[in-house]
Amino acid sequence: MSRFQLEEMLRAGVHFGHLARRWCPKMKPYIFMEKNGVHIIDLQKTLVLADDALNALEAIAQTGREIMFVGTKKQAKRIISAEAERAGMPYVCERWLGGMLTNFSTIRQSIRRMNSIDRMETDGTFDMITKKERLMLVREKEKLMRILGGIATMTRLPAALFVVDIKKEHIAIKEARSLGIPIFAMVDTNCDPELVDFIIPANDDAIRSIQLMVKAVADTIVNSRELKVEQEVLAGMDEEDGDAVEGDAAGE
């Protein structure tokens, strides 16, 4: 059974693509028709491909690895940050820094610098420096937080990327591909689907469409993590029961 309903996709406008004259011919298999100069996405295919993508993301989440959410366009920023935080995943919703993946060691240095300034605010260091120095450090931290705050806890490269608008996030796509990191993405009719490992043909401009898909990804991760915890608890209980049985047998 699909995790989506056709009606909810229609209400969210998932089926509305771009102007036909701006299309990418490689998206032809996922286009249902052209109406008033606009391509209409085949939602039957979206249903199937979205389920495939979510199943694969579920498998990754169960390993405990991280999935990075990426979406820096205006319509996606708040959705990306809110849903990624709910799922406990790293995210980028402001500017993508070149080398965020391919030069991760340098990015980690910037994150450590950000965390260092944060500690200065609480350990009394700020009381020992001038007002001007404090102001400069606060501004530096705010700048770093704006760009790197979503990946502040990330200690290694993500296991996968989930992207909204691969055309806008082309640098992130290029970096992930060069490192062999699987890419899951909402792909509109003006984008090249061959750049993505798991395509979700969908309107990547409408807020409701973005919300529907990003929420589904976050829900999948949250549910997968909760299931993993439940399985670990049950496994622990089974081990305890087994030890108790062995103890009783030894006592006899």
Swiss-Prot record:
The keyword Transferase does not apply. InterPro entries: Ribosomal_uS2 (IPR001865), Ribosomal_uS2_bac/mit/plastid (IPR005706), Ribosomal_uS2_CS (IPR018130), Ribosomal_uS2_flav_dom_sf (IPR023591). One of its GO terms (molecular function) is structural constituent of ribosome. PROSITE patterns: RIBOSOMAL_S2_1 (PS00962), RIBOSOMAL_S2_2 (PS00963). Keywords: Ribonucleoprotein, Ribosomal protein. GO terms for biological process: translation. GO terms for cellular component: cytosolic small ribosomal subunit. SUPFAM superfamilies: Ribosomal protein S2. Belongs to the universal ribosomal protein uS2 family. This is Small ribosomal subunit protein uS2. It comes from Chlorobium phaeobacteroides (strain DSM 266 / SMG 266 / 2430). The gene is rpsB.
